[in-house]
């Protein structure tokens, strides 16, 4: 490996070959020379830039008019496994199953990052290089292009909004075919019936899989007032038949009636989990989970408070993310960067809300009292308490200007899945659509 690196560093093939030969021949015994005849070469001698997979990756992950990325990460996972498992029988046996599983369709994965380029504060690209046609486990990834507009129940002051479109029936069928192939025919159906359907009191395939519409919405936000366990998640799955989804939920709740408490907010009825938390969690419980069916979605999450904010956003009593100018600005930039592309995945993050959470925690009386009680013998806590007492923390508005929102998408290409993510420089005006 060192020989190959030096060869390219020097830039002269003739000189590099001589240097390589002298490097290789130094201190080689007769026994080592004889053994080397039967040892296959580890390196092809080609530069990485001549690798067709790397060339394909870089073509997708670097815009032609941009300078070279500040960071490039590239890996061939199967190749790495093959090299590291050269003398490992277990790895060799596992790799022998890769063609049947379709794992050998994963050719490479790479990532590039460029800082302060063009209109962007940071611009990142990712590419998952897949073979064609995709087979086996690669077909489990059943992401599909579709609508990524935030539904009306997505409120604007969340930390992250993620959404994607997925063919659940296709994924389920692929998993069933793979499991049955390596175990026995009907293994998956037996497991689903005995371990899921009978336990939940429903037909999992008919009532759940076949009623999923394919749209997934994931919201991450913070409860108010700020607390250490305030970050909570809400997941929403679109359904084909809302009435059928409501009946499925009612069947499940009836089976475990003692575990739920019915609640109502506005015109929405939902189920709150009844959990007896240990004493140490009663004042600050980790979660307050719920289940609900609303507006063509099945929703579940870790905070009733955040769900009620979602209802309020749907009803128009608090701002919605889709109407937020910062979100609209980044959505326009995405359209300009990849015109005509319909993503399979979309993410939007507001680091301002993360910063607000920790700022509110640090400045709350409860946190100040905690730090004061535990500052003795702790230089960091002591310095923090002294800074807050001296009023050295700047106003939140000063800090917030350095927390720009960011956006990221993933879309399907002929060579695999490509992702792009960025945040904009300060004071960048929206591009004309």
Regions found by a protein language model. Name each.
Residues 13-16, 254-262, 318-319:
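A common structural junction motif
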Residues 2-4, 81, 243-244, 306-309:
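Short loop/beta submotifs within extracellular cysteine-rich repeat domains
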Residues 158-272:
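Long, K/E/R/D-enriched contiguous segments that form extended
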Residues 269-286:
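Short, Gly/Ser/Thr-enriched beta-strand-loop segments that form substrate-interacting elements
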Residues 1, 287-303:
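Conserved RecA-like P-loop NTPase helicase motor core
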């Amino acid at each position: 490996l060192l020989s190959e690196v030096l060869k390219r560093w020097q830039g002269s093939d003739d000189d590099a070959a001589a240097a390589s030969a002298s490097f290789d021949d130094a201190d080689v015994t007769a026994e080592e020379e004889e053994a080397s005849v039967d040892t296959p070469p580890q390196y092809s001698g080609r530069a990485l830039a001549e690798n067709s997979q790397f060339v394909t990756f870089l073509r997708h992950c670097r815009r032609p008019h941009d300078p070279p990325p500040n960071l490039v990460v590239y890996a061939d996972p199967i190749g790495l496994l093959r090299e590291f498992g050269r003398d490992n029988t277990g790895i060799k046996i596992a790799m022998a199953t890769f063609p049947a599983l379709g794992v050998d369709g994963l050719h490479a994965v790479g990532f590039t990052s460029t800082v302060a380029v063009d209109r962007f504060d940071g611009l990142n690209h990712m590419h998952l290089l897949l073979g064609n046609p995709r087979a086996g486990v690669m077909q489990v990834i059943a992401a599909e292009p579709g609508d990524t507009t935030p539904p009306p129940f997505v409120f604007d002051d969340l930390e992250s909004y993620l959404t994607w479109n997925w063919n659940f029936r296709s994924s389920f069928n692929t998993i069933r075919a793979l499991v049955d192939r390596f175990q026995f025919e009907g293994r998956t159906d037996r497991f689903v019936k005995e371990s899921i359907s009978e336990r939940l009191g429903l037909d999992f395939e008919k009532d759940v899989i076949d009623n999923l519409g394919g749209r997934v919405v994931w919201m991450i936000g913070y409860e108010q007032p700020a607390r250490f366990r305030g970050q909570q998640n809400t997941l929403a799955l679109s359904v084909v038949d809302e009435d059928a989804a409501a009946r499925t939920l009612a069947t499940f709740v009836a089976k475990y009636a003692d575990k739920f408490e019915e609640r109502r907010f506005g015109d929405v009825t939902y189920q709150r989990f009844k959990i007896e938390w240990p004493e140490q969690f009663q004042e600050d419980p980790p979660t307050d989970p719920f289940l609900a069916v609303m507006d063509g979605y099945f929703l579940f999450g870790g905070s009733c408070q955040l769900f009620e904010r979602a209802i309020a956003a749907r009803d128009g009593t608090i701002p919605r993310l889709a109407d937020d100018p910062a979100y609209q600005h980044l959505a326009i930039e995405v359209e300009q960067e990849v015109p005509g592309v319909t993503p399979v995945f979309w993410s939007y993050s507001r680091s301002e809300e993360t910063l607000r959470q920790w700022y509110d925690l640090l400045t709350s009386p409860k946190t100040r009292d905690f730090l004061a009680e535990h500052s003795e013998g702790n230089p960091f806590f002591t310095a923090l308490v002294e800074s807050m007492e001296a009023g050295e923390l700047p106003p939140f508005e000063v800090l917030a200007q350095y927390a720009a929102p960011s956006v990221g998408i993933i879309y399907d290409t002929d060579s695999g899945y490509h992702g792009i993510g960025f945040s904009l420089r300060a004071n960048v005006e929206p591009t004309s659509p």
